[in-house]
């Protein structure tokens, strides 16, 4: 019996976009300060979560999502707040998830939808359809008794296919949405899983907020899914996602450059001597050859704290005489 292969064509336009994205990623890999920009990474993670949930009609703003993640009290629908907490938890799991495992996909869905739906993490046992804003049914998913077999076939293909990951992950994203494996939460889980697949190829994708670009082009996203379904192959969706990924990579390159340009020579000097274990101001000043505590605090410590590059052992009492600083 022939192995299942999702229907799609590799076109010249796809290959051109793939080549351009790979080239852009090559330029981005030269910007090695991303690991030293925890604030940018955190901002991008929050953008990913807020955007993906907003597509599913979550009402919380970027500021509110940030507050929820930072443990602050937020006024809003309890389900929306829980959805943010769940999404943050599952995005933190990305490095541990195996994107080629159906069991890990189910585990991720279980965390994503915990407390929001019955049967979180379990393949659906009922019929589902996709309804647009006008209340029109735009997609009827395959019968529930076919879901397990379809997903196993899809993962078998995903694991063995030699198709370039930018294209392969987009095909998976479309096929997953078509099958609609779960009763709810398929959209946010599908977007998470494409990120997981891309990060298995290039780890930097863990911090590229592709979901934000999808949200900005939400109508085209659903149109690409609809056209692919009508045409019986995922070409339209692949092209849409490649365009989204290209834009997201370009925006990360811009944002990284902007963050780097705001790092002063003093901060760079501090980052070259500070360690990941706590160090006193006296130790750091000695390594930097500084005498003035005022200069040290104003030009070195405070800007590095503001940039999210270092942290204090006692942040509630900044002037504590036993205060220590460490690299994040």
Predicted regions and their residues:
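FIC/Doc superfamily catalytic core
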Residues: 1-328
């Amino acid at each position: 019996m022939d192995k299942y292969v999702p229907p799609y064509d590799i076109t010249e336009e796809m290959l051109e976009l793939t080549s351009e994205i790979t080239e852009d990623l090559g330029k981005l890999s030269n910007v090695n300060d991303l690991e030293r920009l925890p604030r940018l990474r955190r901002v991008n993670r929050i953008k990913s979560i807020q955007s993906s949930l907003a597509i599913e009609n979550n009402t919380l703003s970027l500021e509110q999502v940030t507050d929820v993640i930072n443990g602050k009290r937020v006024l809003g629908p309890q389900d929306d707040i829980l959805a943010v907490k769940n999404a943050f938890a599952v995005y933190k799991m990305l490095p541990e998830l195996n994107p080629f495992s159906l069991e890990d996909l189910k585990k991720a869905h279980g965390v994503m939808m915990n407390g929001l739906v019955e049967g979180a993490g379990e393949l659906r046992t009922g019929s589902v359809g996709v309804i647009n804003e006008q209340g029109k049914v735009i997609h009827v998913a395959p019968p529930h008794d076919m879901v397990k077999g379809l997903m196993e076939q899809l993962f078998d293909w995903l694991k063995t296919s030699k198709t370039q990951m930018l294209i392969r992950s987009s095909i998976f994203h479309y096929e997953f949405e078509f099958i609609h494996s779960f009763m709810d939460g398929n959209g946010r889980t599908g977007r998470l899983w494409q990120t997981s697949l891309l990060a298995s190829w290039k780890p930097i994708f863990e911090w590229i907020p592709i979901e934000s670009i999808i949200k900005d082009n939400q109508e085209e996203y659903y149109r690409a899914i609809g056209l692919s379904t009508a045409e019986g192959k995922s070409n339209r969706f692949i092209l849409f996602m490649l365009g989204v990924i290209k834009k997201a990579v370009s925006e990360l390159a811009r944002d990284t450059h902007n963050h780097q340009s705001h790092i002063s020579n003093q901060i760079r000097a501090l980052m070259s001597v500070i360690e990941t274990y706590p160090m006193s101001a006296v130790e750091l000043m000695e390594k930097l050859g500084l005498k003035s505590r005022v200069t040290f605090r104003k030009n070195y410590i405070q800007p590095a704290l503001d940039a999210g590059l270092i942290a204090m052992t006692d942040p509630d009492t900044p002037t504590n005489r036993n205060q220590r600083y460490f690299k994040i």
